[in-house]
């Protein structure tokens, strides 16, 4: 079986992760003690992707939980599904990273990283054929960003041929938690560009907007936001866990979505987004799902896909529906909005269909798009970064942990390179591509 090892780090990562396990347990009919109480063989058929079966018939998540302070871990442990995790897989320090990337990456985090890697190794050895890792973290804090990227680079060294998927919560434009978020995020992106295979970009503000506008929640809590994220996370891997007509896995996803290795930051969306009360009154159709899924208001990060072009996209449908109809709808979207797709990648929308819908819905879909408009997010963070960095504001917190200003300069230029790469492919046309090839050929002849 193609197992996925789940790692959650920092306060944000642990809260998203806890919500995600609630959703996955529910889909597989596993109760908070790890016993199976479901009613369908399909739930058990590939339960191994995310669970290890213990000797007494209990299912234990393949999850590693880490943090540099015990607080969030305690609340996960006392939460609804706290008892299902393997107690040894909680790895935590006492000091906290204090929203300081350098503490997470170089000092406090570096002291804890070996015990985390031990647990990761143990879990990986329990796998039959490990497909890859999924990491939940935020990029604005200290632990999720600093220690999270440290762990990603260590895992990359040890398991170079396994997929590395991250769910990364970027700092929001208007909702700021700490003043040094731009520093932490830029230093993290510098790592993610090099070491991760696929990054699903999330952002609190976009999630707030969805809750507020679409779900009509007047005061959304982090619980509501995390619920949206976990629905998407579950959708990304549903093809691995349930039988379907068109399957996809992490590697197929990467092959279909990443035209150039550095451009692996995706926007995600989920449909149907209906408020909790009104769900049961509406039957959904594939066209409605498709329309909502491609809607800019549905994107879970603060970038507008209408300001850029899609290099590639992937749509994962769940529920009983005709594959033919799905294909027709996808072609339809591409024909109607052809200006929003780059013309030099033909057939750049992949779709997959999984037969089992999420709890409480007849059908649902998850959208993953590789759009050049994601550069808006990087641009925004970069501007905030530069505003502080050119005055060397708050730098002593980082240099005091042994960092060098050079690292900041490198991270900044790497992020700006990323932005210009996205811009370059946004502006590229098919004719230019041919022209460049001819030039290269002439150069080779000389």
Swiss-Prot record:
Biased composition (Acidic residues): 429-446
GO cellular component annotations of the record: cytoplasm; microtubule
Region (Disordered): 426-446
GO molecular function per UniProt: GTP binding; GTPase activity; metal ion binding; structural constituent of cytoskeleton
Binding positions (GTP): 11, 69, 138, 142-144, 204, 226
GO BP: any one term: microtubule cytoskeleton organization
Spans through the membrane: none
InterPro entries: Beta-tubulin_BS, Beta_tubulin, Tub_FtsZ_C, Tubulin, Tubulin/FtsZ-like_C, Tubulin/FtsZ_2-layer-sand-dom, Tubulin/FtsZ_GTPase_sf, Tubulin_C
Bridged cysteine pairs (disulfide): none
Keywords: Cytoplasm, Cytoskeleton, GTP-binding, Magnesium, Metal-binding, Microtubule, Nucleotide-binding
SUPFAM superfamilies xref list: Tubulin C-terminal domain-like, Tubulin nucleotide-binding domain-like
Cofactor(s) listed in the protein's UniProt record: Mg(2+)
Residues binding Mg(2+): 69
Pfam families: Tubulin, Tubulin_C
Compartments (UniProt record): Cytoplasm, Cytoskeleton
Function (record text): Tubulin is the major constituent of microtubules, a cylinder consisting of laterally associated linear protofilaments composed of alpha- and beta-tubulin heterodimers. Microtubules grow by the addition of GTP-tubulin dimers to the microtubule end, where a stabilizing cap forms. Below the cap, tubulin dimers are in GDP-bound state, owing to GTPase activity of alpha-tubulin.
Annotated family: Belongs to the tubulin family.
Subunit comment: Dimer of alpha and beta chains. A typical microtubule is a hollow water-filled tube with an outer diameter of 25 nm and an inner diameter of 15 nM. Alpha-beta heterodimers associate head-to-tail to form protofilaments running lengthwise along the microtubule wall with the beta-tubulin subunit facing the microtubule plus end conferring a structural polarity. Microtubules usually have 13 protofilaments but different protofilament numbers can be found in some organisms and specialized cells.
Protein's UniProt name: Tubulin beta-6 chain
Gene source species: Zea mays (Maize)
Lineage: Eukaryota, Viridiplantae, Streptophyta, Embryophyta, Tracheophyta
